[in-house]
Amino acid sequence: MASQQNKHAFLSKNRIFHNPDNVSSSKSRNLMDITNTTNTMNGSRPSSMKSSLALPPVKDSFPSVSRSASLNINMSKIKDLKDRQDKIRFQRHTLRTQLIECEREIKTIKFRDLNKSRFELYKKKSKQAKYLKQVRDLTQNLNSKDGERADLIKKNKSALATLQAELDQNLILKRQESQELYNNKLIFWENELQIMENVEPDHEITEEISQLKKTLQELNINWANLQKQNLERQVNHESQLRKDFIAFKEAKLKSMENLTNKHRELLDQIATLQSESEKLHKEIMDIDRQAEYSEQNISEINENIKQLELANNPLISKSLQNSQDLEHLQNQMENLKEMASKQEKFYNDTYNTVEKELLRSRRLENSIIEQKGTMRCYAYVMEQNLPENLLFDYENGVITQGLSEHVYKFNRVIPHLKVSEDKFFTQEYSVYHDMCLNQKKNFNLISLSTTPHGSLRESLIKFLAEKDTIYQKQYVITLQFVFLSDDEFSQDMLLDYSHNDKDSIKLKFEKHSISLDSKLVIIENGLEDLPLNFSCDEHPNLPHSGMGIIKVQFFPRDSKSDGNNDPVPVDFYFIELNNLKSIEQFDKSIFKKESCETPIALVLKKLISDTKSFFLLNLNDSKNVNKLLTISEEVQTQLCKRKKKLT
């Protein structure tokens, strides 16, 4: 259908370009017709008609009425004719626009196919030339390899001839030497024998003769041994020469085999290149045929365009095709939706399994850390704010200083860029939290940083007090938040005012816990139960140098109280030290054991000695990072001391 429309547009465009005056004249005619129709619709008539109707006298009034009626009939017919002419002109105009569009499509298809076929033909010819060049190069290489092969054969033959000649010459020389030695000995002993025969026999001489005979026998034996040794040496030398000759022959045969294999490979390459050149030639012939076929198709398209000028059904067929395409696309969309739902289900299943495995591995890691000791030390790292000489090994939990190569060990080193505060509590910290709740042991989380880190506290409150969590379902949760200081006034952070009395926050040390005389909030509906001043930005950070304590008590919902005995809660303490002065006091009073009996020091000693401890070092300041790193070393030394005491 597209080809017929293109042909239709091609012929119509030629017609329009050859007769541009017709278009302008038709436009002017249309304008004139529109004015005429408007005049007739307004009821206006030509001036000649008006004058003709006004001229007759009163006497001839009857014939004038009949004449006006006939004129009205003629005007209505003229109006109908003009309406028909307008419709015909509109249809002609639409047909011309369709012909122009078809002609444009034909031109685009024609030039596109011809350019594409020419480009493919040029491409195939360039490939053929390239392959022919490769064939010529390979034939030259093959001829050169044949020459090298012939030279090697000649060299091998000449080398074999020289070796055989050397072997024959050595044998001849050895035989001549042995023959000369034998002749000399024979002449010597014949002379001696003649001398002895000429000498008159004597007793001493006879003895000497007998002695000489013995020596002769010994010499014969030695001579026979020498002959045997010479023969053995000759055999060994010949066998060695044969081995050398065989090895030389095998080496040369291997080189010959390699050359023959290369020759065969080159012949195979020539055959493949010839077959590819034949294929390319066939493809070129096919392209030529396709070009001829495309020309025939173009001629057929032109003929179909002529037929399309008479028929007015392409729009219907096109609409049917569009509806079919729409149905096909809708079916594809449904299939894609089904596939997407299946993939989403598969992804959710795999994600759940991965989460289960990660939770299992975290629990296993937590149990291993629990076996090592009661204190944990994690590093929460912001690399962009730290000096460049620190090297971080996240897998092994190690931080190394580049210059001194001093190593600081942690249970975990967590990057802030990959793990946010919310993810830290849900992924890394939750296993420790759940373990302490299940074991019903009081525990703490001590956050140490040289700069304020209020977002960590906010994430902790969300983790503990958010609605519809597992902790809300299993426990009744109470929360207290106070600020303690040795130098300034202490404050109850849940109240909307600050007390002026330094001793306004009273502490009481109990067995394995600390009670706070401050406002207590029961969290049942999530964060809505917290005071407004706690959720707003009135106190984003701690007021001044000191320590912030959040005490959270978990009362089990399913525990049954006997008589007056209340259910025993599990206490959790969040300690926040976010300035250098407080950290130095913490280091002196806890690890270096200096005499510092301040309230903050007593609270920290009580919590570290009677509850499970979790140290979180927030490394986010390049100036005072060494102080926190030394605290990590001291935590590790305290852990080793506790292990020794236990053993």
From Swiss-Prot:
It is found in: Cytoplasm, Cytoskeleton, Microtubule organizing center, Spindle pole body; Nucleus; Cytoplasm, Cytoskeleton. Keywords: Coiled coil, Cytoplasm, Cytoskeleton, Nucleus. InterPro entries: Vik1/Cik1_MT-bd. One of its GO terms (molecular function) is cytoskeletal anchor activity. It holds the Pfam family Microtub_bd. Interacts with KAR3; the interaction is direct. This is Spindle pole body-associated protein VIK1. It comes from Saccharomyces cerevisiae (strain ATCC 204508 / S288c). The lineage of its organism: Eukaryota, Fungi, Dikarya, Ascomycota, Saccharomycotina. The gene is VIK1.
